[in-house]
Amino acid sequence: MPDFIALTRDVLEKGRSVRFQVWGSSMTPFIKDGDVITIVPVSAESDIGLGKVVAFLHPWLTGRRLVVHRVVGRRGSSFLIRPDHALGHDPFAYKLCDILGRVVRVEISGTHYSSRFRQGREEIDFHRR
Protein backbone atom coordinates (compact mmCIF):
# COMPACT_ATOMS: atom_id res chain seq x y z
CA MET A 1 0.00 0.00 0.00
CA PRO A 2 1.53 3.36 -1.02
CA ASP A 3 2.19 5.90 1.73
CA PHE A 4 0.49 9.29 1.90
CA ILE A 5 3.49 11.28 0.68
CA ALA A 6 4.12 8.99 -2.30
CA LEU A 7 0.45 9.08 -3.23
CA THR A 8 0.27 12.88 -2.85
CA ARG A 9 3.39 13.38 -4.94
CA ASP A 10 2.07 11.05 -7.66
CA VAL A 11 -1.27 12.90 -7.87
CA LEU A 12 0.40 16.33 -7.95
CA GLU A 13 2.92 15.22 -10.60
CA LYS A 14 -0.07 14.34 -12.80
CA GLY A 15 -1.26 17.95 -12.50
CA ARG A 16 -4.18 17.20 -10.17
CA SER A 17 -5.04 18.82 -6.83
CA VAL A 18 -4.97 17.04 -3.48
CA ARG A 19 -7.34 17.66 -0.56
CA PHE A 20 -6.62 16.46 2.97
CA GLN A 21 -7.13 17.22 6.65
CA VAL A 22 -4.23 18.84 8.49
CA TRP A 23 -3.17 18.53 12.11
CA GLY A 24 -0.94 20.69 14.26
CA SER A 25 -0.80 24.31 15.32
CA SER A 26 2.17 25.71 13.41
CA MET A 27 -0.02 27.70 10.99
CA THR A 28 -2.64 29.03 13.43
CA PRO A 29 -4.67 31.16 13.21
CA PHE A 30 -4.57 30.90 9.39
CA ILE A 31 -4.86 27.11 9.20
CA LYS A 32 -5.97 25.25 12.31
CA ASP A 33 -5.80 21.66 13.49
CA GLY A 34 -8.56 19.72 11.70
CA ASP A 35 -9.00 22.13 8.76
CA VAL A 36 -9.07 20.60 5.29
CA ILE A 37 -6.75 22.12 2.68
CA THR A 38 -6.43 21.77 -1.07
CA ILE A 39 -3.01 21.97 -2.66
CA VAL A 40 -2.18 22.29 -6.34
CA PRO A 41 1.08 21.35 -8.04
CA VAL A 42 3.95 23.79 -8.51
CA SER A 43 6.31 23.33 -11.41
CA ALA A 44 8.29 26.55 -11.58
CA GLU A 45 9.74 29.11 -9.20
CA SER A 46 7.17 31.59 -10.52
CA ASP A 47 4.42 29.42 -8.92
CA ILE A 48 5.88 30.20 -5.49
CA GLY A 49 6.11 33.74 -4.21
CA LEU A 50 6.33 35.74 -1.04
CA GLY A 51 3.36 35.04 1.23
CA LYS A 52 2.27 31.83 -0.51
CA VAL A 53 1.52 28.83 1.68
CA VAL A 54 3.22 25.68 0.42
CA ALA A 55 3.33 21.98 1.22
CA PHE A 56 6.84 20.56 1.32
CA LEU A 57 8.82 17.59 2.54
CA HIS A 58 10.52 18.49 5.80
CA PRO A 59 13.95 16.83 5.59
CA TRP A 60 14.69 16.79 9.32
CA LEU A 61 11.47 15.39 10.72
CA THR A 62 11.20 11.64 11.13
CA GLY A 63 10.01 10.05 7.90
CA ARG A 64 10.34 13.28 5.86
CA ARG A 65 6.87 14.51 6.80
CA LEU A 66 4.68 16.66 4.60
CA VAL A 67 4.50 20.11 6.21
CA VAL A 68 2.51 23.25 5.34
CA HIS A 69 4.21 26.63 6.02
CA ARG A 70 4.52 30.09 4.48
CA VAL A 71 7.16 31.46 2.08
CA VAL A 72 8.71 34.52 3.75
CA GLY A 73 11.60 35.26 1.39
CA ARG A 74 14.32 34.02 -0.96
CA ARG A 75 18.01 33.21 -0.58
CA GLY A 76 19.55 32.57 -3.96
CA SER A 77 17.59 29.73 -5.55
CA SER A 78 16.09 28.66 -2.21
CA PHE A 79 12.79 29.66 -0.65
CA LEU A 80 12.77 30.79 2.98
CA ILE A 81 9.86 29.09 4.70
CA ARG A 82 8.54 29.22 8.26
CA PRO A 83 5.32 28.57 10.19
CA ASP A 84 2.98 31.47 10.98
CA HIS A 85 2.75 30.49 14.64
CA ALA A 86 6.54 30.75 15.16
CA LEU A 87 7.30 34.25 13.89
CA GLY A 88 10.30 34.57 16.20
CA HIS A 89 12.07 31.60 14.62
CA ASP A 90 14.42 31.96 11.68
CA PRO A 91 13.05 30.54 8.42
CA PHE A 92 14.61 27.50 6.79
CA ALA A 93 15.74 27.38 3.15
CA TYR A 94 14.18 24.83 0.77
CA LYS A 95 14.71 24.13 -2.92
CA LEU A 96 11.91 23.95 -5.47
CA CYS A 97 12.32 20.15 -5.60
CA ASP A 98 11.35 19.94 -1.89
CA ILE A 99 8.07 21.81 -2.45
CA LEU A 100 5.20 19.60 -3.57
CA GLY A 101 2.38 22.11 -3.91
CA ARG A 102 0.71 25.37 -2.99
CA VAL A 103 -2.34 25.76 -0.75
CA VAL A 104 -5.28 27.27 -2.65
CA ARG A 105 -8.20 26.46 -0.35
CA VAL A 106 -8.87 26.05 3.36
CA GLU A 107 -12.07 24.45 4.66
CA ILE A 108 -13.17 25.14 8.22
CA SER A 109 -15.85 23.14 10.08
CA GLY A 110 -19.30 24.75 9.93
CA THR A 111 -21.38 26.40 7.24
CA HIS A 112 -20.08 27.44 3.82
CA TYR A 113 -18.61 30.88 3.17
CA SER A 114 -15.94 32.28 0.86
CA SER A 115 -13.50 35.17 1.11
CA ARG A 116 -10.06 36.28 -0.08
CA PHE A 117 -7.07 36.77 2.20
CA ARG A 118 -4.95 39.82 1.32
CA GLN A 119 -2.33 42.17 2.81
CA GLY A 120 0.73 40.62 1.18
CA ARG A 121 -0.48 37.08 1.64
CA GLU A 122 -1.73 34.47 -0.78
CA GLU A 123 -5.31 34.90 -1.92
CA ILE A 124 -6.90 31.66 -0.76
CA ASP A 125 -10.54 30.65 -0.79
CA PHE A 126 -11.91 29.91 2.68
CA HIS A 127 -14.96 27.69 3.05
CA ARG A 128 -16.89 26.44 6.03
CA ARG A 129 -17.85 22.79 5.75
Give names to the regions the model predicted.
Residues 1-129:
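Extended hydrophobic leader/signal-anchor segments used for secretion and membrane insertion
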